[in-house]
A protein has these predicted regions:
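Secretory targeting and sorting signals
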Residues: 1-31
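Flexible, surface-exposed loop/gating regions in the mature catalytic domains
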Residues: 30-295
Length: 295
């Protein structure tokens, strides 16, 4: 049994109404036929997905707080906002691992180094299936660095560093993230981890919002017309038992609105796995992918 602090959502609430129509788009650089639309219960297969993970703030801290987080609220208003999204535990590290590998690995505290070898994870499954993956960490001293901390960089927020099946070349500093003229070169799935000041861990909500706007708003706009997706979520709330967090999907053919099905990191992982036809890893197995937010 996995440790989870999320609420329980009645099964009846996840009925047929939660299966909206969707389309499939083939990742750039992956051999494929032209994009086609599939059955109504499908999940889009985007050319590019960028996942951004913020730190230690609850749903109510962010959503509606247009003074400190105007850009994040713009994304929430224009994209799909999951209003019943929960982290799985405390503290930070196991939540990152839950979203990346479907497992908290029994952690009850942040640890470095945490060596999980070739345990299957989202990145390794993408690579094995012929897709591409990269993790971009702000402040990482160099590609593939195994250092635990360096300035405002902390490896505990970059879960791929814990696995030997993610090549060093796929563990990059954020400075290597493509410029706006070259977003088409992005891997199939990217994770972006701001540093401790820019992800709300040490810095303010306003600082994190400004960083996201400055560094990824151009990608978000580009995504809406280039078969791509941005996911912005949080590792955990501010250490309450409720552990409700914002999760926002923004991009092409995301159906604007608020969605109240109960989700956690495992459900988001399951959605990405089904998006690319990957094997389910860890506790994402049997979880419900998100199917009702797509046009």
């Amino acid at each position: 049994m996995r440790l989870s602090l999320r609420k329980t959502w009645p099964a009846a609430a996840l009925g047929a109404a939660g299966l909206a129509s969707a389309f499939v788009l083939i990742p750039g650089g992956h051999p494929a036929a032209p994009a086609t639309k599939l059955a109504a219960s499908s999940i889009p297969q985007y050319a590019h997905v960028v996942v951004v993970m913020e730190e230690n703030h609850s749903f109510s801290d962010i959503i509606g707080n247009t003074t400190d987080a105007p850009y994040m609220n713009q994304l929430a208003d224009e994209g799909a906002l999951m209003t019943s999204s929960y982290a799985v535990t405390h503290p930070s590290d196991p939540n990152y691992l839950a979203l990346f590998a479907g497992n908290t690995f029994g952690l009850t505290a942040d640890e470095c180094p945490l060596k999980e070898g070739n345990t299957a994870n989202l990145g390794s499954e993408l690579l094995a299936a012929g897709y591409t993956f990269k993790g971009y960490s702000e402040g990482l001293p160099k590609a593939g660095s195994t250092t635990c901390t360096s300035g405002n960089y902390a490896s505990k927020h970059s879960p791929w560093v814990n696995f030997s099946n993610i090549p060093a070349a796929d563990q990059q500093p954020f400075s290597a993230f493509p410029s706006s003229s070259n977003y088409a070169s992005l891997p199939t799935v990217s994770w972006v981890i701001p540093n401790l000041n820019d992800d709300m861990h040490n810095g303010t909500i306003q600082e994190a919002d400004t960083w996201l706007d400055s560094n990824l708003s151009a990608y978000a706009t580009w995504a809406t017309t280039h078969d791509s997706l941005l996911i912005v979520t949080w590792d955990e709330d501010d250490y309450t038992e409720n552990n409700q967090i914002p999760t926002i999907f923004y991009g092409q053919d995301v159906a604007q609105g608020q969605y109240d099905e109960n989700i956690d990191h495992y459900d988001v992982l399951a959605t990405l796995e089904q998006m690319y036809g990957l094997s389910e890893v860890g506790d994402s197995s049997g979880e419900t992918p998100i199917t009702d937010i797509w046009n």
